[in-house]
Amino acid sequence: MSNILQNIFIDYYEHILYELHPRQTEIENISKMIHCGDPSYGGAFFACPDCGELNFVPFRCNSRFCPSCGNMYNQKRSFHMSCKLVNCVHRHCVFTIPEELRIYFLNDRSLLNCLFHSVRDVVLRMFHKQNKAELFTPGFILVLHTFGRDLKWNPHIHALISEGGAGNHTVWRPCTHFDFRFLRNSFRKVLLDQLTNKIGKSFCKVKNEMYSKHAEGFYVRAKPNHCKPDVTIKYISRYLGRPVIATSRIDTYDGDNVTFHYTRHEDNQTITECIPALDFIKRLIVHIPEKHFKMLRYYGIYAKHHKQESKLHKCISSEKHRYLCKFYNWQNMILLTFGYDPLKCPKCGKSMFAFEVYYKKTALFEQYRKVMGYG
């Protein structure tokens, strides 16, 4: 049974191909999402050893653009993120860019790497300058969101930063003071310098305008939010791993127009928009990342082994990690996401086993082309 998002894309699939001229990665993700759960694309037969009941479970698309599979992916990703966290307070910071710069990142998506590199350099510098002998290194996770609540193109970085760092000699030093002025000015300088190196001299005029218009730096939200470890883990699952839009935010679709709602940042008012379906699709697909592009990245002590790592206490111990990993298998993820146990016999309730697996028939050349990466 298809969801409302699948229905919208199925109805407008030809319009997408011939009017919007989507990127290759957009076509691939849209096609996967449309056929997610389609039995004709393969699946597995499960049999009950007691009553002989057969149950067919279709394959899922595993696309992050799909609301169902994207939710499963985010649950797994949130779990692995939480296993890396040191047992300390973390601060949620948001690094934004002026509206005038957004078009550059839309026209050349490789520039999105500059956002990650700029935030990384600024955060590490803020900690390193506290003590040049110790070079305190925090643990931080950066997540790129290219969308605002209204679904329009608005690339920005969400950072989850430990309020403390590991030094060359000191195991851990707390750091509760984040220098707002340093963050704003340094982020502006580093990002504009990187963009100038990538784009060239043609960007110099824009760079000078940015310094004039944003004399106090680019906006960085870094207020203390008292994210204790247990709150941090819940926060990661709820916010950092969220999809572009949840199906619960889509109110109606009448075949021509889509009505959806969101909560406006400025005043927390619920805003309802009704726009043509094709415009709604355009707002969504622009946020599909290029293939193999990492939207989430680990830095500092979370990126690699640090000499003090063995002495640091994690939010989730290694024993608990091994235990919880058992619950993140295919069966339990289906149960958590879709609300049913695919291996439970619908008649007698006993556990079923895999009986046979079916795959969609494809030409040998198509399989070869996919493996070799042609086309």
Where would I find each of the regions flagged by the language model?
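Beta->alpha loop/short-helix hinge microenvironment recognizer with preference
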Residues: M1-G375
